[in-house]
């Protein structure tokens, strides 16, 4: 998958998530403000719970909006061996067992998965431990992470 197509698919996925979340937030807001959900006693908390849900969904929608804006403004850069891996690079890592992972180092949207099977791309950001470890690395460099007391070693086998 080329990076231009990948960027377009990331934007589409974020737009889809944004649409779903806006509808869910609107539904929760309507539930929170509905006359039938006004508390009749101190144990009647349906309206309060709905307002907490609406607030959380609105906060998540703002995060997705920020990610969407970041990707809409993202200038894709080719991998430059002199600079190493940077934001907007597509990277293939291989672990010691030969398992490969396809990663896109993006500005936002960590955890987003695009595609399926061996061609699935996972979005990571520089704020994540793996993203931090990748910044500045080059093809054939080793990347080591300690997660939950276990050292994970990967080799950068491709960067674009």
Q: What does each model-identified segment do?
A:
Residues 1-82:
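N-terminal intrinsically disordered, low-complexity, charge/repeat-rich segments that act as generic
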Residues 81-146:
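Non-DNA-binding regulatory cores of transcription-related proteins
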Residues 97-98, 144-160:
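Short, charged beta-turn/beta-strand-edge "cap" motif at the junction between a beta-strand
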């Amino acid at each position: 998958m080329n990076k231009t197509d990948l960027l377009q698919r990331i934007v589409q996925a974020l737009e889809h998530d944004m649409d779903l979340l806006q509808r869910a937030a609107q539904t929760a807001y309507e539930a929170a403000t509905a006359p039938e959900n006004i508390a009749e006693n101190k144990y009647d908390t349906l309206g309060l719970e709905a307002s907490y849900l609406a607030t959380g969904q609105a906060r998540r929608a703002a995060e997705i909006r920020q990610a969407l804006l970041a990707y809409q403004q993202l200038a894709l850069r080719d991998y430059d061996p002199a600079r190493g891996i940077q934001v907007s690079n597509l990277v293939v890592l291989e672990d010691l067992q030969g398992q490969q992972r396809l990663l896109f180092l993006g500005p936002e949207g960590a955890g987003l998965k695009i595609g399926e099977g061996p061609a699935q791309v996972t979005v990571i950001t520089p704020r994540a431990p793996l993203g931090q470890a990748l910044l500045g690395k080059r093809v054939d460099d080793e990347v080591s992470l300690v997660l939950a007391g276990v050292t994970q070693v990967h080799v950068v086998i491709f960067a674009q």
